[in-house]
């Protein structure tokens, strides 16, 4: 992918523009801009899922696919590997990045924790889109307890 600084700048501008266009939360308190960002990420994830794994299409298990996300996909997008992958062996995976590039530039402080979710929506869509292309239906959520670390929870939905 492109230079990390360009991607970070583009992402920051997308978030800022969508937030400026959608100042009030909709019904249920969820902003439509979060859905738009996740949709953008989903489409990018689909494209990357089609492009990246051609050499490694021997995924035998869900765990192999998640390892691919943590290593190959994360390196292609963020130029670093995911720090941790945990599972309960029942279809739930937790991916942890202790220095998530899209949150690194944010100041650490409790007031900024409220702003963090809007910077994670695109990446949730990215993960979900890549998994979708690889034939895995999933639900991806993100959480931040302390900046710049974040966790992505991937719940595999059995068909």
From Swiss-Prot:
Give the UniProt record's GO annotations in the biological process aspect. endoplasmic reticulum to Golgi vesicle-mediated transport
Recorded GO cellular component terms are: cis-Golgi network; endoplasmic reticulum; trans-Golgi network; TRAPP complex
Q: Which residues carry this modification: Phosphoserine?
A: 33
Which key words tag this protein in UniProt? Answer: Endoplasmic reticulum, ER-Golgi transport, Golgi apparatus, Phosphoprotein, Transport
Whether Endoplasmic reticulum counts among this entry's keywords is: yes
InterPro entries referenced in this protein's UniProt entry, alphabetically: NO_sig/Golgi_transp_ligand-bd, TRAPP_component, TRAPPC6/Trs33
Record-linked PANTHER family: TRAFFICKING PROTEIN PARTICLE COMPLEX SUBUNIT 6A (PTHR12817:SF2), TRAFFICKING PROTEIN PARTICLE COMPLEX SUBUNIT 6B (PTHR12817)
Family assignment? Belongs to the TRAPP small subunits family. BET3 subfamily.
Protein name in UniProt: Trafficking protein particle complex subunit 6A
Where does this protein come from, organism-wise? Bos taurus
Ranked from the top, the taxonomy reads:
Eukaryota, Metazoa, Chordata, Craniata, Vertebrata
């Amino acid at each position: 992918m492109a230079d990390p600084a360009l991607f970070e700048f583009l992402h920051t501008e997308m978030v800022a523009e969508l937030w400026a266009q959608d100042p009030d939360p909709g019904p249920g308190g969820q902003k439509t801009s979060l859905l738009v960002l996740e949709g953008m990420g989903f489409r990018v994830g689909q494209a990357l899922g089609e492009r990246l794994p051609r050499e490694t299409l021997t995924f035998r298990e869900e765990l192999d696919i998640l390892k691919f996300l943590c290593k190959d996909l994360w390196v292609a997008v963020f130029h670093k590997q995911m720090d941790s992958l945990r599972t309960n062996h029942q279809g739930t995976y937790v991916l942890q990045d202790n220095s998530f590039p899209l949150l690194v530039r944010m100041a650490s402080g409790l007031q900024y924790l409220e702003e963090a979710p809007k910077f994670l929506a695109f990446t949730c869509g990215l993960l979900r889109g890549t998994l979708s292309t690889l034939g895995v239906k999933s639900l991806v959520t993100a959480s931040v307890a302390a900046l710049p670390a974040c966790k992505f929870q991937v719940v595999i939905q059995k068909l």
